[in-house]
């Protein structure tokens, strides 16, 4: 049975990805220890994989016990809403530390295991990694950088499959925070309507589709938006 490590597994999209891959893969549920991660592990019968993408030692410890890894899903991410003039350098550093540098560091640490399995690396990017919208300055910049890293990895590691997925707005806690920010700056009512957004399960299904594509196919990118 192939193996899959999912970062940010306790989140809305992460837990949906875990559920989507559970029937076909041995899972490692990556993330900081939390009751939510423990509950997901119990529900799926999969081990938690303690991981802090801002801590180099945590990344090395998580990677060193895996000799082979078939699938790595980079799902962890942070968002600090704000226009350029509102932002502060610390938010930019924090955005890049998790969204880019953490993903790069974990990929490098797991590269021997991925090469050994001729594995697949999936990056959960964002529509913000293709087009910049007001109030998404540091997040968009980090997602554009993540897209470039995925493209570089694909070019430099021909034995691996590398897929970037660019979901539009998805019903998650991060989305609720973004809507609250947008409502505050526009004096809106702040009403959150999940029906306007993609379901996490929809994004997870696309991950499963990419991962389960036969060996003769290599899915480079998937773009999906709310219908």
Name each model-derived stretch.
Residues 107, 142:
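Active-site helix of classical SDR
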Residues 10-11:
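Conserved glycine-rich cofactor-binding loop
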Residues 24-39:
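Conserved glycine-rich Rossmann-like NAD(P)H-binding loop of the short-chain dehydrogenase/reductase
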Residues 126:
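Residue(s) in the substrate-gating loop at a strand-loop-helix junction
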Residues 160, 164-167, 183-227:
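C-terminal helical subdomain
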């Amino acid at each position: 049975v192939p193996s899959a490590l999912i970062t940010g597994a306790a989140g809305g999209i992460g837990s949906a990805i875990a559920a989507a891959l559970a029937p076909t893969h041995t899972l490692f549920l990556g993330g900081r220890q939390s009751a939510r991660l423990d509950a997901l592990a119990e529900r799926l019968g999969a081990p938690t994989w303690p991981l802090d993408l801002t801590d180099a030692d945590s990344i090395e410890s998580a990677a060193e016990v895996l000799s082979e890894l078939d699938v790595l899903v980079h799902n962890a991410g942070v968002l600090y809403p704000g226009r350029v003039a509102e932002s502060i350098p610390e938010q930019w550093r924090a955005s890049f530390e998790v969204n880019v540098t953490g993903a790069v560091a974990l990929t490098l640490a797991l590269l021997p295991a991925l090469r050994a399995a001729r594995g697949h690396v999936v990056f959960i990017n964002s529509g913000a990694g293709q087009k910049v919208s007001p109030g998404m300055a540091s997040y968009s910049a980090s997602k554009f950088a993540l897209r470039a890293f995925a493209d570089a990895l694909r070019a430099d590691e021909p034995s691996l499959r590398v897929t970037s997925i660019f979901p539009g707005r998805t019903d998650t806690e991060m989305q609720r925070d973004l809507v609250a920010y947008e409502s505050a700056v526009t004096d809106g009512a702040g009403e959150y309507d999940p029906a306007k957004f993609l379901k996490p399960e929809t994004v997870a299904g696309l991950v499963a589709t990419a991962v389960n594509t036969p060996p003769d196919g290599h899915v480079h990118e998937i773009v999906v938006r709310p219908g």
